[in-house]
Amino acid sequence: MRAKKVVLAYSGGVDTSVCIPYLKHEWGVEQVVALAADLGQGEDLEAVRQKALASGADQAIVQDAREDFVYDYAFAALQANALYEGRYPLATALARPLIARILVKCAQAVGADAVAHGCTGKGNDQVRFDVSIGALDPKLKVLAPAREWGMSREETIAYGERYGIPAPVKKKSPYSIDFNLLGRSVECGVLEDPWAEPPEEVYAMTKCVADTPDQPTYIELEFERGVPVALNGASLGGVKLVGELNRLAGENGVGRIDMVENRLVGIKSREIYECPAGVVLVLAHQALEALTLPREVTAYKRGVEDTYAQLVYNGLWYSPLRGALDGFIDFTQQRASGVVRVRLHKGTATVVGRKSPYSLYDVELATYSEGDSFDHKAAEGFIYVWGLPTRIYAQVRK
């Protein structure tokens, strides 16, 4: 027996559904509590809960975690402009430490001696769950049936069918999909060929560019200390703001990402992401920082952002390093307040305006027209001192 009572991170998909009978029949677990987190994935979570019970769970719980997800994870990463390998807004990676936190709290509440997840041995999520759970409760046992059972996807589906679990995917195109409020990721099937163009059927949040409006859509995003608080002048809570921005950007074909990325486990993986709100928010936030942060801070922050994104992707959300980086990021956001105007059109998002009460932009210094207050005479002395090391080096070389 691996454990008596287990809390399982449950999604309603093939792997987590099969985990329920597998834990009971193969590993002798006496009680399985299926826990589904509502992260804005748009599913009928009551149906997911009922499916868990039908699959053999002794108890099935749905927890609304949308507010926590947006404010504690998504917006924290936004302040860091966190994009993995410069492109991916980390929608899935950000959800895992939150789910781990919910799992641990539930396990402690119901007296479980272990938690479980349905991650395979190839993916990043196994690392994110195991490391996060270990950081939150080092004594809690973590079970990963899909990492050990050695079944192919077809065999996993067949195993589930033995226990009355229907397969929710077509065997001819078995896409693996993860979806939450911040975005959607798709892999498997024809997408495993990096040369193959993704069929339109893999997309759900964004329109094909050919079907988008001919006229651009303009939006205004207001930020306070790096956190979005209003869209087009309307103050909105984080969940509603992200949802509405997903709709507006998605209708204009914004947010599609097709990339071959480097997984933590050492392999390359072709991933299709849809992150309409995530892409636009990072773009707008970067534009606001360009207006309000000094040059040296902006330059240094880029390195912090890359490290931050790697930490999140690699499952180190609860690491001391991320906590230390948060201190720096929090300082940079003290004056990251203002409004950014973005044009959405035919698959592109373009910043076309920005303003802030803390703007470091001085039009009288920047203008080439009448009213120029820049001291042009000072430039000669500045250039002499600035270029002095280069001239000395050139003299020595001679």
Swiss-Prot record:
Q: Which residues form the signal peptide?
A: none
What CDD domains does this protein map onto? ASS
Q: What positions does the entry give for L-aspartate binding?
A: T120, N124, D125
What domain of life does the UniProt record list for this protein's source? Bacteria
Q: Which residues bind L-citrulline per the record?
A: Y88, N124, R128, S176, S185, E261, Y273
Q: How does it assemble?
A: Homotetramer.
Q: Which NCBIfam families match?
A: argG (TIGR00032), PRK00509.1 (NF001770)
Q: Which PANTHER family match?
A: ARGININOSUCCINATE SYNTHASE
Name under which the protein is recorded:
Argininosuccinate synthase
Q: Which organism is this entry from?
A: Gloeobacter violaceus (strain ATCC 29082 / PCC 7421)
Higher taxonomy: Bacteria, Bacillati, Cyanobacteriota, Cyanophyceae, Gloeobacterales
As recorded in Swiss-Prot or TrEMBL, the protein's gene is named argG
